[in-house]
């Protein structure tokens, strides 16, 4: 995995992402940390985790995340709900592709340390959102859209919407 940090973020946010990277590298020793301005150093077949709303690679790789996200003006749409990036932090995993792609966006620099601590406990989910206080407001599996166990009889692909369930334990 390559954790790609945003070079265009404000200084305080860049420092918070550097702390995030250090924490995760202690937990995951094989994690490579790279700056989004040094994309030539990233192999074409690399698994990527993009950090920060201002990450330069979001423009290039973000298309794969569009299967689970949408936009409503400036807000992100996840599971039919709107989340603004000024008061919500999100973590997303692309539901398909030969190589893994993830994105972590923080509401602000102060939210990043708690994401470093919390996200490893939510690794089975493909979509997460946290409010400004750090409380989890969405945890959902990413839809499976490209599986050998799936066959589409038409060109149009539709996603199955499962009913919302309340967790047995919070």
What residue ranges belong to the model's regions?
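Solvent-exposed alpha-helical segments and adjacent loops
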Residues: 1-170
């Amino acid at each position: 995995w390559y954790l790609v940090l945003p070079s265009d973020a404000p200084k305080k946010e860049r420092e918070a992402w550097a702390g995030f990277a250090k924490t995760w590298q202690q937990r995951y020793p094989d994690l490579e940390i790279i700056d989004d301005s040094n994309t030539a150093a990233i192999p074409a077949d690399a698994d990527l985790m993009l950090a920060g709303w201002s990450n330069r690679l979001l423009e290039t790789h973000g298309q794969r995340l569009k299967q689970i996200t949408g936009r409503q003006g400036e807000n992100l749409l996840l599971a039919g709900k709107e989340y603004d990036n000024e008061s919500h932090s999100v973590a997303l995993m692309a539901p398909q592709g030969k190589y893994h792609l993830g994105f972590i966006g923080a509401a602000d620099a102060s939210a990043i340390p708690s994401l470093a601590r919390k996200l490893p406990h939510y690794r089975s989910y493909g979509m997460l959102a946290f409010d400004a206080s750090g409380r989890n407001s969405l945890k959902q599996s990413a839809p499976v859209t490209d599986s050998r166990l799936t066959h589409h009889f038409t060109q149009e692909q539709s996603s199955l919407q499962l009913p919302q369930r309340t967790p047995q334990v919070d």
